[in-house]
Amino acid sequence: MVFFARCAAVLLTAFGLAAGFNTSAFGQGFARPDGSVPVPMDWSSRRVFFTTGFSPEQAERMWNEPRAYAEWHLHGNAPAGSGLVRKRPRPRRPFRRSRGDMKKDWAVSLGAGGVAQGMLPAKYAFDVNATPSCTADFVVFPVNASTGNARANVVGTFTGEPAAGATTAITVTPAGGTAVTLTLMSSTTTNTGLDFQVSSTVATNASNLAAAINRNLASTALDRVVAVASGTTVTVYALTPGTGVTLTDASTLGTNFSWGTVTAGANGSQANIVAFNHLYSGSGTSLCNLTNPEFIFSYASGVGPVATSPSLSLSGTEVSYVENDPNIGAILHVLTFGSGSTEYGTSCASNNNGGATLPTCATNPVIPGSTSGSTATDFMLPLGLVAANAATAVAGAADSFSSPFADYATDTTFVGDNNGYLYAITPTFTGTPAYKGGNFPVQVSVTPASLSPTAITATTTVVTVTVANSLSIGELVTIAGVTANTGNGCTTPDVAAINGTQTPASMSATQLTFDATIPSATTGCTLTGATVTPGSNYLSSPVVDVGGTGNIFVSDSSSNLYELTSAGATAATALALGVNGATNKGAINGGIRDGAIIDSTNGVGYVVAACNPNTLGEADTGTMGNAGLIQFSFTSNTLTAVAFAGLDTGANQNCTTAGFPTYAPTPDDRYYVLGIGSATVANNGEIIGAASGTGGQQLKAFQFVSSTLQTTPDMIDKPQIGTGASVISPLTEFFINSQLLTVSGVTATTTVVTVTANNTLAVNDLITLSGVTSNANCSATDVSAINGGLQTVVTATATNFTFDATIPTATTGAGCTVTGATATGGPDYLFVGMNENPSAVYTLLLPGSLLVASGLPPTMPVSNTADVAGGTSAMVVDNDSTAGQASSIYFGTLATSTTICGTTSAYCAVKLTQAALQ
């Protein structure tokens, strides 16, 4: 009955790896004593995957790798011919000829913020070998909204050099807890430990005091304080926000330093991280017999929004995520959450019971571990402030795109920020979280040099800077030294609005623009000594090759791809994937905004660059090149670009218009099961990519020959979803192995196999035959071609189905022997969200939906237009289950609604059933 143990045994045997392996120990690192197998499914679950052909060393690593189990949970990808039932199929259902809309099971308000574009919730399955659990399975939604909390703080000011040997102290007192005092001592010679060095340089005194505070963080979550230096001042913050923590200060530093008045913390009313259980609820008969889910917790965790995806611990009791505090920068949280009515506001307790009344807990949050009664622990580690800027104690950068990746084998979390730094935290979930040190943090993407502009002009709303440009939309740039020129209408107020840190809205190789409120339009300011200083490149989410090299792959917003060792050293020369000559054409729409996907078995990976001048496979009418799908190969010390495939015909203009990010591709089920190593295209899987812009959205499926991506799309098809400008969500694939058929007959020509059965399969379903044997009418070589391989249904009726295959000799008479023969299979789906054409969640069958003439819309058997506002975040899928509402997808809306999750305008957490798809 235990599916994964069976999967392990068959896989090891199939590859000659069984000797010396105890298959009962497969997954021994996290299988519970009772045999139950938990599987966390977060953003990283689909970033590292394993296909047929893995090595013994990779098999050993997979024993303790939850992402392998998540893959098998969703695919069951044993090798062809193994005889393994790839997933536990369901009883037969009536023959499927049509599919209706996807139905909403439930939608719950997230308040003033939703899941950020391109990010996704995280789902925890308590035991994938059992019926889905109403109480133990849960989903976590990050909320991209500020909480309204404030951190208690106090400002200290230096006016000179304090006396050596004097002290200053900060005391933190949690409500109901024990006060903890941090005492620092001034020194003219020592700048380590609790000592901070002082001199006549006043600003350095501030930096040294702040740095001393930051290197002496408390070991308990509620007692942590940090400090930010700015000029001659030091601002100390209690990391735990709200009224539950108070700050007091003391100082004997004398007249050259003083503390100001303490500003108390404040409690907000907006959650930035929430979780639900009783997921399998909804109208009609549901597994949980409820109408709505229940909140496990609703937390206002810190001050700032959570703009990226969370990661889950193996135990399912902890969550890691990044908060962006406007004063401190990015902060990694490791949250051990509580449960019960103390973990959400009292005003929502009465409607958090799964009934018909929608719960409103997202706007009634508590501060984890601080609000009275909360049993949570919220451990916070400021990233840039404490780790990258340890010496200067200036505020760290935010984190816009980099989600934390948990390497479960070492309990190390990797995460990046907008200044090009990659951080490592270990332990994360098994002890008190701590900075790893060593090479970390490592600035993998270094700050570009300052440039001299040749012209700056402005309307009243847009500033145009003429300068040699390598920036990307969304990256920061600092303009300095611009002065007034009254002859050209450039006034002092104009200059005040132009100088400073700006965010580019459009660019070319020779100029950039940014939006600003300019008092008067100008034809040119004075630029003597003026500089344009790019900010460092934003990092994407890091991905660790947990099944192979153990190396880290991370990209940046200028389309560079890096490979680092687990120790933070450079493993291979970086790839500049957006560069043509000296011009970076990848620097638009965030460069490589999404993390890589790593095929650990085959030693290849994939990224999507927003604009790549090297793409092949079609003519492009765009001026910058295509949005490009790049395949790369890697070893422990090499990184090589293999193939560049265009994702956009040029009509959609993804490469010349801001606001349309591109995301990583997704393999189809055939890729997982068949791999990509065959020299014959038909024996390999496919990978699907998408691009969007002002002219619509395009999907493309690409094939493989001998592990190399073929840059011409499958059958030269380029389906166009629509022609309206629309953001597009990341692609989500899910194979539903829903059918188990008893085969009553098999006949074949040399090209077509006909299977007789009480058929419930549909055209384009994927199927595997087993148990077919030879006889006088059917040769052994015929049987070898019929059994085991993953096939695609070409025609289907209530009594039979066919698939194409190369059969050595046509069968005769009654065909092959089918005693005990079965066919298992089902549909392979692709989910994608749009905000135009119309706004909907679309479902496509793979590969058939994409095999249409160029420019035509793909075949979309299922959609949902009622429960999408402004498009969707990325999606997470859960089970392949027959239980009511237990086979679903989860996402957030990108805009507010007054109909989807209540009548009060709000962003929504949505669960759609897959029942209509099956």
Predicted regions and their residues:
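Cys-His-centered catalytic/binding microenvironment captured across papain-like cysteine peptidases
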Residues: G529-V532, T817-T822
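Extended, beta-strand-rich, solvent-exposed assembly scaffolds of outer structural proteins
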Residues: A150-N267, S298, P448-T528, Q739-G815
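Generic detector of N-terminal low-structure segments
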Residues: A5-R6, L17, T23, A516, ...
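Mobile, glycine-rich extracellular loop/lid and propeptide segments
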Residues: Q28, K87-N149, V234-V236, S258, ...
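Intrinsically disordered, low-structural-confidence terminal and linker regions
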Residues: A9-T13, L17, F21-P94, T243
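Bacterial N-terminal signal peptides that target proteins for export
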Residues: M1-L11
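Boundary/junction segments of secreted and surface-exposed precursor proteins
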Residues: S24-V48, W106-V115, Y124, A150-T157, ...
